[in-house]
Amino acid sequence: MTRTTTCVYHFLVWNWYIFLNYYIPLIGKDDEKLKEFHDGGRSKYLTLLNLLLQAIFFGVACLDDVLKRIIGRKDIKFITSTRDLLFSTLVFPISTFIFLVFWTLFYYDRSLIYPKGLDDYFPAWLNHAMHTYILLFVLVETILRPHHYPSKKLGLALLGACNLAYITRVLWRYSQTGNWVYPVFASLNPLGIIIFFLVCYILNASIYLVGEKINHWKWGATVKPLMKKKK
């Protein structure tokens, strides 16, 4: 892709996520059946947090594209570094994680993650927008341009910190309301929940490492010299 095409692509995807972040909170806002969905805000759902994260990332990517064209430089240190850090440590791992875990649980027993009653409010296209297209967009981004990964120690630490923050949010929500964010937790005993969280982090960390490998496989010759310049 040319720089102009890449910029247009980032702009279109950015606006797609802006639309989703605006539209989804309005669904069934005054409907008593969706009261639990709206109570506590979007921060209790990893899927909705990810949509916000995607909007931020593609906004930064679009800004990076525009500034490079205006200034005429290949690299704008702070913006480009922020873009790459967001993508490598959060956007790629979390989007892939949501896709894998959601659809695995959905086809095993959808009541554990996405009860059938939600179909009345969230049409199929919106379900796929939240849980399927997110993977498509990050894979396109991986192929579209190289991303400079931090050290494994830093990358996994940042990912782990975000995992811990979200787990804390889930547990705090349960302690305040007695309701689990996702039905799957209600089917597990305390040990099962601990194991579930551990497995989720291991999966997230594995996805991070796979993303790094894919990036190196596709862009290794391009990325290496730039990474050496940072030293």
From Swiss-Prot:
Function text: Hydrolyzes bioactive fatty-acid esters of hydroxy-fatty acids (FAHFAs), but not other major classes of lipids. Shows a preference for FAHFAs with branching distal from the carboxylate head group of the lipids. Regulates the expression and the cell-associated anticoagulant activity of the inhibitor TFPI in endothelial cells (in vitro).
Catalytic activity, reaction form: 9-hexadecanoyloxy-octadecanoate + H2O = 9-hydroxy-octadecanoate + hexadecanoate + H(+); 12-hexadecanoyloxy-octadecanoate + H2O = 12-hydroxyoctadecanoate + hexadecanoate + H(+); 9-(9Z-hexadecenoyloxy)-octadecanoate + H2O = (9Z)-hexadecenoate + 9-hydroxy-octadecanoate + H(+); 12-(9Z-hexadecenoyloxy)-octadecanoate + H2O = 12-hydroxyoctadecanoate + (9Z)-hexadecenoate + H(+)
Record-level Gene Ontology MF annotations: hydrolase activity
Tissue: Highly expressed in flank organs and weakly in testis and earlobes.
Keyword tags: Cell membrane, Hydrolase, Lipid metabolism, Membrane, Transmembrane, Transmembrane helix
Protein name: Androgen-dependent TFPI-regulating protein
Gene: ADTRP
Protein EC: 3.1.-.-
Transmembrane segments: 8-28, 46-66, 86-106, 124-144, 155-172, 191-211
Swiss-Prot/TrEMBL site (Important for catalytic activity) positions: T47, H131
Extra facts: Expression was reduced after castration and reappeared after testosterone treatments.
Coiled-coil spans in chain: none
Cytoplasmic face of the membrane: 1-7, 67-85, 145-154, 212-231
Cell cycle in keyword set: no
Membrane disposition: Multi-pass membrane protein
Biological process terms in GO annotation: lipid metabolic process
Any one annotated GO CC term: plasma membrane
Keyword Hydrolase: yes
Predominant cellular place of this UniProt entry's protein: membrane
UniProt induction comment: Up-regulated by androgen.
